[in-house]
Amino acid sequence: MEKEKLTDVPLHQIQIKDAFWDKYIRLVKDVILPYQWNTLNDNVKDAAPSHCIKNFKIAAGEAEGDFEGAVFQDTDVAKWLEAVAFTLDSSGRDEKLEKLADETIDLIGKAQCEDGYLNTYFTIKEPDRRWTNLKEGHELYTAGHMIEAAAAYYNATGKRKFLDIVSRFADLICETFGPEEGKCHGYPGHPEIELAPVSYTHLRAHETG
């Protein structure tokens, strides 16, 4: 017997009208995302500096300094962008929020290396040690969050820039890892990259028909 095939329902086709959930949906859009944006930019007085946006500015050549934060610090920016994407997709477009996201994506593009590599820690601090510590370096974990965020943002806005950025990074990862001779035969110490290409491939499949 043939099994029924399940398909995702796009967020913009779902309407939640509920006194309990409406309150939290508005809270995310109006309070949490702006607060997180200020935190990423080190503008929250009582919060420890995250250095997230600053690291990207340094990698992009727009600021001077050393990398600060955890080796996976870039993922906070990716998670914020993904949350923005889901909000835009489910609650409708918001010009101010979308502008902040677009500017952040522009910065990420400037921080990307010529070969497609994207990771501010290794770009700034240890450029010669890419892919040398897959267990603790979190490069593929970070890449996974970037790819997922880009897929969500493309789905919400139809804008390709972020998707094109991570496509270059995904191509580099495919060129670097694999069973073939001369490629890296390793796997990450933290899961995330495994889920990301599913979202990416799903979008690409729709593009190509």
Where in the sequence are the language-model features?
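A conserved hydrophobic secondary-structure block that centers on an alpha-helix together
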Residues: 133-192
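Acidic/His metal-coordination segments adjacent to aromatic residues that form catalytic metal sites
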Residues: 127-133
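Extended, well-ordered alpha-helical scaffold segments
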Residues: 17, 24, 94-110, 157-176, ...
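Short, flexible helix-adjacent loops and helix caps
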Residues: 61, 89-93, 113, 123, ...
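Single conserved hydrophobic/aromatic residue that forms the stacking wall/gate
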Residues: 202-209
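Short, solvent-exposed turn/loop segments enriched in Gly/Ser/Thr/Pro and often Arg
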Residues: 104, 116-125, 165, 185-194
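Low-complexity, Ser/Thr/Pro/Gly-enriched N-terminal "stalk/linker" regions
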Residues: 1-76, 102-103, 107-122
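Well-ordered alpha-helical segments within folded domains of soluble proteins
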Residues: 21, 72-89, 138-154, 187-199
